[in-house]
Structures are given as C-alpha cells and as structure tokens.
C-alpha cells in the first residue's frame, strides 16, 4: 500500500508554512506522499473571500513543483458539495484502492473534530495525524487512530498574506517565488471585491 497523507485546506493562498509542514509530516510519519487537497469550501468556514478554485489550484501546483512526495490535488473540487472529509476519504479509497489514506490535521481542527460529518467513521476507518497549532492545544485524549506529531510551524498565515498584499507590502519570504510572481501577474488579492 502507498501511504498517502491528505492535507486539506483552502490554500488562499498557499504559503511556505504549508509546504514546510507537508514536508515535515511526510518525513516524521513515513508517508510516501502528501497530497495538498485544495478544498472548494470548508463547511465550517465562511468563504466570502475565497479566491476562485482554479487560481488556488494553480498556485498550489506552482508551489509544489519539483518537491518530491508533495502533490497538489484538485480531487475534492470534482466531488459534490458541500465538501465533507468523510465523503472525500471514501471516494479516494474507492478510486485508489492501492493507497492507504492518512488524514493530516491541525490541533485547531482536532479540537472541533467531534462536530465533523461522520467523525466517528473517520476515526474507525482512517489513521489521523494531528499537529498542534499555536493557541489550539487541548487534551487530545488517547485514540487508536490519532497520532500526535510535533512539527515546527512557520509563523505565516494566508490571512496575513492577503492583508499585506492589500496594503501593498511584500510577500516574497512568505510564499514560493513562483506563487508570488503568479499573484503579482494576476493582481490577486490586491483590492476588495
């Protein structure tokens, strides 16, 4: 079986912190690949400032180009909405029977995990790797399916990047060069819609 980590997110935009985390989780957990699953929407978040799916997907592709074992995936964009992790994992398992899918999530999502659609089925059927995020540490409890992995988190957020762009400030150290160039070329995030 090919062990494949699923790292879902809006990636609005993708940044160096996402790439660093994917690399660390792959190395620390022995995953063969990490798929950055660009999500069309998060059922628990409002998506009013969410950039077009294709633009976010293109930035993800640019960000992972040449990075071994890290793949940008638009798989979830082709599934019925809203986008629920349980549905995505079930569909992936059916379409890729040679792969063992492992769900990667931050401590902030783990803290709300019992609110997720079919969370109990996810726990029963899939391994989960949780990385603590700042201000999100809670008692994780002991489950057979969750593995806590310490990772060095870069102090970067997509929200901060969007705000810096709107303010006319640079982002080159926050995102891969190809992503910064793409954002600039397309004029993304520069003005309020």
Regions found by a protein language model. Give the residues of each.
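Nucleotidyltransferase catalytic core that binds NTPs
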Residues: 1-193
């Amino acid at each position: 079986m090919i062990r494949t980590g699923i790292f879902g997110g809006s990636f609005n935009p993708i940044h160096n912190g996402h790439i660093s985390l994917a690399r660390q989780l792959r190395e620390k957990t022995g995953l063969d690949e990490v798929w950055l699953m660009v999500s069309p929407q998060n059922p628990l978040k409002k998506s009013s400032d969410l950039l077009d799916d294709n633009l976010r997907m293109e930035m993800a592709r640019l960000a992972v180009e040449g990075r071994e074992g890290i793949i940008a995936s638009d798989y979830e964009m082709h599934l019925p909405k809203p986008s629920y992790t349980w549905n995505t994992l079930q569909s992936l398992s059916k379409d890729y029977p040679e792969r063992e899918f492992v769900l990667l999530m931050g401590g902030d999502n783990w803290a709300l995990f019992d609110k997720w659609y079919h969370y109990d089925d996810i726990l029963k059927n899939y391994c989960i790797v949780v990385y603590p995020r700042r201000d999100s540490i809670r008692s994780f409890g002991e489950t057979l399916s969750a593995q806590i992995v310490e990772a060095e988190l870069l102090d970067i957020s997509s929200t901060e990047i969007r705000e810096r762009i709107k303010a006319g400030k640079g982002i080159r150290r926050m995102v891969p060069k190809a992503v910064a160039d793409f954002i600039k070329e397309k004029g993304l995030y520069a003005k309020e819609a």
